Amino acid sequence: MGNDERKRPTKKMKYGGKDDQKMKNIQNVEDYYDDADEDSRDGEGEEKRRDFTDLELKPDHGNRPLWACADGKIFLETFSPLYKQAYDFLIAIAEPVCRPESMHEYNLTPHSLYAAVSVGLETETIISVLNKLSKTKLPGEIIDFIHASTANYGKVKLVLKKNRYFIESPFPEVLKRLLSDDVINRARFTSEPYYGGDGFTIGKTSGELEAGPGELLNEAELAAAAEEKETHSFEIDPALVENVKQRCLPNALNYPMLEEYDFRNDNVNPDLDMELKPHAQPRPYQEKSLSKMFGNGRARSGIIVLPCGAGKSLVGVSAAARIKKSCLCLATNAVSVDQWAYQFKLWSTIKDDQICRFTSDSKERFRGNAGVVVTTYNMIAFGGKRSEEAEKIIEEMRNREWGLLLMDEVHVVPAHMFRKVISITKSHCKLGLTATLVREDEKITDLNFLIGPKLYEANWLDLVKGGFIANVQCAEVWCPMTKEFFAEYLKKENSKKKQALYVMNPNKFRACEFLIRFHEQQRGDKIIVFADNLFALTEYAMKLRKPMIYGATSHIERTKILEAFKTSKTVNTVFLSKVGDNSIDIPEANVIIQISSHAGSRRQEAQRLGRILRAKGKLEDRMAGGKEEYNAFFYSLVSTDTQEMYYSTKRQQFLIDQGYSFKVITSLPPPDAGSSLGYHSQEEQLSLLGKVLNAGDDMVGLEQLEEDTDGKALKTRRSMGSMSAMSGANGRVYMEYNSGRQKSGNQSKKPKDPTKRHNIFKKRYV
């Protein structure tokens, strides 16, 4: 699903494209791609896979926009007159790998083709359009791979009825095949009435139409077919739904489950009186993303990927307004809960008593039978003891059939803690929103069965050219380590303080201070300074006398600081820890200075860039400025000759794949800055070095955030320094205890038989 997914067709095919009859007997699409999940851009055999000299060019290849290779790679020319149509098609059937300005690279994968057929594209339509756009004759390997990946889609549905999950299919033989799998068989409930001859529940369902070749690029919504079909189904355990969906994916049984919600014909769940306001006008790319979600009068579960600042909130509110059923909206923290509640009221006609917040500080309920609840992932997934009021609210959430489960920053869902949310709540349709569909633990592909396929992904550079998001100048500022700091950095005994040493590098501090002064005084910009290292965050903020927000900052104080940053002319810089990475809306900010980060996290780099991607000024002014008119700036300060250089290169990879480039700056601060900046003298630098070395290891590490549990604010694991901590005896006391277990009653442990003791100790017990 994400950029990390590299499975694709190879030339080791079991049969040629002519043997179409065998296609009907395909059970496992794994036969069509290598078992190894390697990156095709590296490794052995690269030259062999890259040799496409046998591809046959079409006579009019100059008029066609893309190259389709036998290994599943597709290259798109962005300067082609057909670029826009080709991009809309490719983003529906393939995974983007790298999208610089002139040439895009995509991969055909089983999951991308699963997503394609889920939005209504037929197998033959995919092959036909891909062949029309390709400069070469479409390789037989790709044709076979498309057939294998899409052959079984739509044969199995996952349906929610009265808080019970059913696997439904018009083909009883398919259900038998699924039940032959141990995982699915163990998940089956056998208490259903009205069995057919095969032991399945028999019912009726309305049919549907699929998109044809002529309707592919027009995105026209098709009407639902009126024909009714006989369906067979069996019930499964709600706690095992995740396992069942995973087993049905293309890399397993290859019967990907169709999750669609026929909300217009749902007469069981009450309707929510909610419409979009007249001023809520979705942009073209927002409309396109919604058209991928809605078709045939039904809502599909899946993921929409839009850059930060591109209007994901409006997409989410629009989806909820179109379904008009109860909606559960999940965010990452209490600040974003407030922002989502505000967005619902801003863009829709929902009444104040129909929307409520559920956080550790605010436990509200909506009035009536239907409404919107905005809460955090932690509040739902928390497994500890709750207050009586919170327990009642959670129980209501568990028992309710939600029309829409709206998940912001959906890339966090694969985490063990957050994925429990999917099984705790029951919803007909799931929509995930994110800007960065990447994770360093390779769990991003789990979203295929936790949520659904990727429905749409926007191209960042296209939105920049359209003036929909800011045009950002990215720069990496190289800060040489001072002699004293570098000497301590190289010492083995300081291994736990290496990060603190290169973050607190005096030259990095001076560069940071210079950039803040330049952008505040000469440009009048609003600046965010990011630091994962809590020790550095505190030292920088106190030295420069700027407000800061970190894990232990109360919700009230956070709100006050952010409000002052947005409205006050005197508060132009704010320091943020990693709590500011996600879901904090600061549209006024247009400069980011990053002084420390979380190792090589590509997602964090993109999320932080997203804090300044909100479009600035009027659309006409942005368009008139041209692509070279930068209106936002992203600085990553790196201490040279340290581990930070390696991490910085890795972190930038996602943004480079989106078409961004990083300018390297080696002369900050300028030589004439002199003593006007802090830590100019060697005495000041040595004093700072002593402070870093004398701090405890727990004080100079990364900020560790606790779970946002019920009744407890988001806090950090931090303690005040003391002499006992310096000696290594912090929190330790002397006490005696009896390690032997006492038996029930007054009987004590019987003494050991002296004859069974070791010879050395026998004489002591004579």
Swiss-Prot record:
Biased composition (Basic residues): 757-766
Keyword Hydrolase belongs to the record: yes
Tissue: Expressed ubiquitously.
Localization of this protein: Nucleus
Catalysed transformations (reactions): Couples ATP hydrolysis with the unwinding of duplex DNA by translocating in the 3'-5' direction; ATP + H2O = ADP + phosphate + H(+)
InterPro entries hit by this protein: ATP-dep_DNA_Helicase, ERCC3_RAD25_C, Helicase/UvrB_N, Helicase_ATP-bd, Helicase_C-like, P-loop_NTPase, XPB/Ssl2, XPB/Ssl2_N
Classification via CDD domains: DEXHc_XPB, SF2_C_XPB
Domain Helicase C-terminal positions: 510-676
A Pfam family that the UniProt record links to this protein: ERCC3_RAD25_C
Binding site for ATP: 306-313
Chain span(s) of sequence motif Nuclear localization signal: 749-765
Keywords on record: ATP-binding, DNA damage, DNA repair, DNA-binding, Helicase, Hydrolase, Isomerase, Nucleotide-binding, Nucleus, Transcription, Transcription regulation
EC number(s) per entry: 5.6.2.4
Induction context: Higher transcription in light than in dark.
Motif annotated as DEVH box, chain positions: 408-411
Subunit structure, interactors included: Component of the 7-subunit TFIIH core complex composed of XPB, XPD, TFB1/GTF2H1, GTF2H2/P44, TFB4/GTF2H3, TFB2/GTF2H4 and TFB5/GTF2H5, which is active in NER. The core complex associates with the 3-subunit CDK-activating kinase (CAK) module composed of CYCH1/cyclin H1, CDKD and MAT1/At4g30820 to form the 10-subunit holoenzyme (holo-TFIIH) active in transcription.
Name of the protein: General transcription and DNA repair factor IIH helicase/translocase subunit XPB2
Organism whose genome encodes this protein: Arabidopsis thaliana (Mouse-ear cress)
This protein's encoding gene: XPB2
